[in-house]
C-alpha cells in the first residue's frame, strides 16, 4: 500500500534481484552472461538427483556454538544465535580468544548427524564450512587461515582432525550427498567488504577487496579439490552493493564448473532470495504461496528459531509441524533444507533429534509421496496438498473428512486407491460423484493413519485432469479466500509481499482506483450450503479510512443476502491488520464468484486485504 515509502515495500523489493543487465543487441555478451548460460545448459542433468531428493539437512556449527546465544553471561534474545558476535559487538580477537578453547568437537559427532539425517528420510546435507565470523571447519592452507594477527588463524579443527572431512565422509557412508555452505561475508578478514558492525577490525587505509576475493576463491578451490564430489556449494550473503562480480561470481562459477562439473550451486552469489542466477532459489524460513514457477527452489528452515545452537531458544517445531512443512513445500515443487544447530561438542539438542526421529517414522510409511515427486496439479485443495509421479497421484490429507468422503476436484480414470500405512491390500472406493458436480470422491476410513498428514495413493490411467479451480470449504467448514487465489482487475491493484526472511506475509494492496476488483471462484459442495458468517482481515491508514465497499456473490440470493456492504475502518496503518465482521451471506450448493469491490474512496487508497474467511455460525 503506497503511504509514501514503507519498510515492507522496501524489503519486498530487496528480495527481488535482477539478472545481469542485458547487453545491447550490438554488444557481445558479457563474461557473466556467458558463464550463466553455460551453467543453464547442463542444469537439468545436474539437478536430477536434487529434484528426486526433496529433503536435506542444513547444519550451522562453528565458534558461535559454545556461546549458545549468550555473551559474558548476558542473554541475547535475537533469534539467530550464530550472529552472537554481531549482537554483542565482540571484537574479533576477543571472540576468538574466548570461543576457541570452548569449541571441542567430540569424536563421532558426524556419524550421529548422518544417522539422524538418513533415518529422517533426508538425502543430502549441507554444513557451514565458513560462516560470517570467518572461521573455517575445513583445514585451509590460505596464509590468512593458517595464521593472522587478528584471530590467530581461521582453522578451528582440533589437531590432527579435519571437521569438514569427517562430515563429508560420514554422510557419504550413509548414502547421503555432502555439500558445503560458504559465507561470502566475513567479519574478520581485513580486506573483506565492511559492514556497519563494531566487531569489524579497523584497518589503516582502504581495504583491498581484490585480495579478499582471491582469498574466497582459494577457499572454494580447496573445498572443490579436497573433499570429494560435492552436492552443492551454498553461497550466502549478497545485497544491493555486494553481489555478482563484487564476489568474482564469473570466476567462481567457472571454477565450480571446471573442477566439479556435476555440482549444483544456489543463487546467493547474486542479490535476492528468489533471483534466478543460480540452479535454485533460496527462500529463507518462508514458503512461497504458489511456489516459484519457472525455477527450482529450496526453503531453508529451522527446528527452533535459530540456525546456530541456542541454549535459550526452546521454541521447537514438533513432528507434525515439520511433516506439514515438508508436504507443503514439495507439493509446490520445492525442496526443504531443514537446519540443526549442534552444540560445541557437536551434539544435536534432544528436542530437535526427537522431532527428526518422528519425521523419519512418517517417511518410512509415506516417503514415496515425497522423494521423486513433482508439484501438485491443483491450485489449492481445501483439505491438504498433493504430489505426483507418472501415473500416480498422492493426496496429502491434513484435515480428515468427518463424513468419510474425500472430495478431489479432478476427473480421469482411477485404477486403484489405497491409504498408505493402512492395510496394503485394502482398496478404497473412488468414483466421480454427480452430487459433487462430477468431482472424484474417495471413500476413506473413519480416522486417519496420521493426524498430521495421511497419504492416499491413486493409480491413474493417464494424467489427472483437474477441474476448473474452485475454492471449497475445508472439512472444518471454513472457506478461506487468500490473495494468491484472487483474480485482480484494474490499474495498480496487486499482491504485495511484506518481509524478506521468516515472517513473510502477502496482501492485496495498491488499491488506488475504486474501479478495481478482487474476485474468487467459490464452490459449495453437497451438504455445504447454508448461511456463512464473513470476516475480513484488513488494514487501512487512519487518514484514508472511510471507503465504502461491497462483498457480493454472483447469483440470485433471496432477500438480497448475496451482497454485504461495509465501511473500511482505520486500523492504525497499512500493515496494521484487524479482523472485521461483515455480516452473513447465504450460499446454495454450486459454483459462485465472490467479488470484493470499492464503492467510494475518500482517501489515497481503499484498503489492504490479507484474507476473507467464511464459516457457518
Model-found features: residue ranges?
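Short, conserved beta-strand segments of beta-strand-rich sandwich/propeller modules, principally
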Residues: 453-455, 531-533, 591-593
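Bacterial N-terminal signal peptides
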Residues: 8-19
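Acidic/polar, compositionally biased interaction segments
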Residues: 579
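Short beta-strand and strand-turn-strand segments in soluble, beta-rich domains
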Residues: 574-576
